[in-house]
Curated annotation (Swiss-Prot):
This protein is not a protease, but it activates plasminogen by complexing with it. As a potential virulence factor, it is thought to prevent the formation of effective fibrin barriers around the site of infection, thereby contributing to the invasiveness of the cells. The keyword Signal applies. Gene3D superfamilies: 3.10.20.150, 3.10.20.180. Pfam families: Staphylokinase (PF02821). InterPro entries: SAK (IPR004093), SAK/SK_sf (IPR036120), SK (IPR008124). Keywords: Plasminogen activation, Signal, Virulence. It comes from the Bacteria. SUPFAM superfamilies: Staphylokinase/streptokinase (SSF54328). The keyword Iron-sulfur does not apply. This is Streptokinase A. Residues 1-26 form the signal peptide. One of its GO terms (cellular component) is extracellular region. One of its GO terms (biological process) is symbiont-mediated suppression of host neutrophil extracellular trap formation.
Length: 440
């Protein structure tokens, strides 16, 4: 980042109304939630893309937010992963500005970039901010960086700031190992999700267990991991079985660049070569060797034993209808359509002017299709074959000035009982009698 975070974000700021979460979702595009409550703390919205160094190729990065008023725990980090260096600090007038360190911002963007990766060859490393990176407030004011690259933002009044522009990235390459680790503790955690809608399933607490200690280059197979997952499932959710693997990811010594294992085929994981891990002894202050770790995190879809997976594309239970609308005087085909429905109860007339009739399959007028002034005549033909049911509705021009729902057979508010019986032609199509006797 230069001495300033430069950018032009006028177009985006036009759509951004600072002070509400709605504006944040406007940056994100899809999925914004108008019912979310307004923000209570000032936030920095990071909406950036990556530019691959030496090319014009862009890399997508999901937008995210940084809470500018959250205090990191003693020596810890905020929920965005910012170090204690990036934190609010008191001033003489009592306001609490928030100092954002350049390194912390780049690290947060790096984590968000990695969160989108689904294969090991898709990793990019964030190098630096591009020249168009800028932080602005709701009024378009640009906040410039200090000489050390940090930016200080006010937190009062509560508002949302915007970091927009680009970061420079390059394909990630592992560094040569200088001091190789001898062994690695392989830890395991698993998460289960029901494949079918299941109100009985209660997710268990994620627990991490030590599987084994392996040397660099030793292996563990997908079958071993599957057996481990099923063993845990048998204890936490008896009566369920694993249907399929959703993901398997290995985190190496808390490195953000993880190994993504195949989810749709068998695999063998070879323990990755890496540097020997060290930590500072809190009593002596001396750097000492510590255990290297691989955390294998898996997700599986599960089913109740004996249950079949729900197939949203299964149409075996649906019935095919061909609906034809014909001019009763000329036999001209006005409109034809084929429909699939799970219930013949839907074979009833709907009023295009009444939204309560959405589930019904037949139209009492065709105005919505720009076929104007037609109405029902009471003549309906119903023909069946092995795979199809053809319903032909004969229509005629309705009297001048009559509304679109003229001759609607079940409009009890407009027609007498005698008139309703005269137009109850659907009874001849085999449509089931309503369950409610009052509707007969």
């Amino acid at each position: 980042m230069k001495n300033y975070l430069s950018i032009g974000v006028i177009a985006l700021l036009f759509a951004l109304t600072f002070g509400t979460v709605k504006s944040v979702q406007a940056i994100a595009g899809y999925g914004w939630l108008p019912d979310r409550p307004p923000i209570n703390n000032s936030q920095l919205v990071v909406s950036m893309a990556g530019i691959v160094e030496g090319t014009d190729k862009k890399v997508f990065i999901n937008f995210f937010e940084i809470d500018l008023t959250s205090q990191p725990a003693h020596g810890g980090k905020t929920e965005q992963g910012l170090s204690p260096k990036s934190k609010p600090f008191a001033t003489d007038n009592g306001a609490m500005p928030h100092k954002l360190e350049k390194a912390d911002l780049l690290k947060a963007i790096q984590k968000q970039l990695i969160a989108n990766v689904h294969s090991n060859d898709g990793y990019f490393e964030v190098i630096d901010f591009a020249s168009d990176a800028t932080i602005t407030d709701r009024n378009g004011k640009v906040y410039f960086a200090d000489k050390d690259g940090s930016v200080t933002l006010p937190t009062q009044p509560v508002q949302e700031f915007l970091l927009k522009g680009h970061v420079r990235v390059r394909p990630y390459k592992e560094k040569p190992v200088q001091n190789q680790a001898k062994s690695v503790d392989v830890e395991y955690t698993v998460q289960f999700t029901p494949l079918n809608p299941d109100d009985d399933f209660r997710p268990g607490l994620k627990d991490t267990k030590l599987l084994k200690t392996l040397a660099i280059g030793d292996t563990i197979t997908s079958q071993e991991l599957l057996a481990q997952a099923q063993s845990i499932l048998n204890k936490t959710h008896p009566g369920y079985t694993i249907y399929e693997r959703d993901s398997s990811i290995v985190t190496h010594d808390n490195d953000i660049f993880r190994t993504i294992l195949p989810m749709d085929q068998e695999f063998t994981y070879h323990v990755k070569n890496r540097e020997q891990a060290y930590e500072i002894n809190p009593k002596t202050g001396i750097k000492e060797k510590t255990n290297n770790t691989d955390l294998v995190s898996e997700k599986y879809y599960v089913l109740k034993q004996g249950e079949k997976p729900y197939d949203p594309f299964d149409r075996s239970h649906l019935k095919l209808f061909t609906i034809k609308y014909v001019d009763v005087n000329t036999n001209e085909l006005l409109k034809s359509e084929q429909l699939l429905t799970a219930s013949e109860r839907n074979l009833d007339f709907r009023d295009l002017y009444d939204p309560r009739d959405k589930a019904k399959l037949l139209y009492n007028n065709l105005d919505a299709f720009d076929i104007m002034d037609y109405t029902l005549t009471g003549k309906v033909e119903d023909n069946h074959d092995k795979n199809n049911r053809v319903v032909t509705v004969y229509m005629g021009k309705r009297p001048k000035g009559a509304k679109g729902s003229y001759h609607l057979a079940y409009d009890k508010d407009l027609y007498t009982e005698e008139e309703r019986k005269a137009y109850s032609y659907l009874r001849d199509t085999g449509t089931p009698i309503p369950d409610n006797p009052k509707d007969k």
